[in-house]
Amino acid sequence: MIEIKNLKFKYNQDQTSYTLNDVSFHVKHGEWLSIVGHNGSGKSTTARLIGGLLVADSGQIIVDGQELTEETVWDIRDKIGMVFQNPDNQFVGATVEDDVAFGLENKGLPYKEMVSRVQEALSFVGMMDFKDREPARLSGGQKQRVAIAGIIAMRPSILILDEATSMLDPEGRQELIQYIEDIRQQYGMTVLSITHDLDEVAMSNRVLVLKQGKVESISSPRELFSRGSELVDLGLDIPFSALLTQKLKNQGLIDCEGYLTEKELVEQLWEYLSKM
């Protein structure tokens, strides 16, 4: 679905090093790939290059078999929906309903189909009761849900999230992550998320780590979380379940190898307690 080959980019020619330096990776159709790393590692730059908002110095970006060029950029943008950290910058409609319908109006969809898509999208993210509200009067989590509804209505094949959950409280963050997974499952969207959030990373199929503009590793979330204290050097926290698992192992209370999810850790503890 997305193939990146030997991508190089710098914001100005005075930079002594590239923001992205020979980056290559791929994202399969229907996959959720998270990109993580320290601030300045090139995560958001990668998202903007794929979305055609920036132009690479060299390398190739291929989306759905089509190489991104000046001639194809608008075709490729039609296949991609992007949600940023601050959704206020994306709102254009006077009401929630108007905002979700905006992109469909620009595409010239028949009125009945447009109404149907808007209602379906708002219902999917639980915002139908807010359709007549001004977007500015919504909470942060509600604003992000409206932004995602606008993308659902457009039916792109790729959803790019650029720190979309970073401004939300823990409950709102968890709700949004679940909505994204539901969208991926129901609509078959490919998801690319730029994030520091461990819950978001845990939901993904694979995780790409960028370090100083280069690909440091590509692995499953489980493999990444098993790296323990190395995660701090990569701009991530150590998952609570990993810290607790290590302490329990040190005390001889559980016997396991590698990272355990919270669910797996609970199962291990129940097994231990049942033997007491």
UniProtKB/Swiss-Prot annotation:
Record flagged with keyword Cell membrane: yes
UniProt cross-references to CDD domains, sorted A to Z: ABC_cobalt_CbiO_domain1
Membrane topology: Peripheral membrane protein
MF annotations from Gene Ontology: ATP binding; ATP hydrolysis activity; ATPase-coupled transmembrane transporter activity; riboflavin transmembrane transporter activity
PANTHER family in UniProt: ENERGY-COUPLING FACTOR TRANSPORTER ATP-BINDING PROTEIN ECFA1, HEAVY METAL TRANSPORTER
Oligomeric and partner information: Forms a stable energy-coupling factor (ECF) transporter complex composed of 2 membrane-embedded substrate-binding proteins (S component), 2 ATP-binding proteins (A component) and 2 transmembrane proteins (T component) upon coexpression of the components in E.coli. May be able to interact with more than 1 S component at a time.
Protein name: Energy-coupling factor transporter ATP-binding protein EcfA1
Source organism of this protein record: Streptococcus thermophilus (strain ATCC BAA-250 / LMG 18311)
Lineage, highest ranks first: Bacteria, Bacillati, Bacillota, Bacilli, Lactobacillales
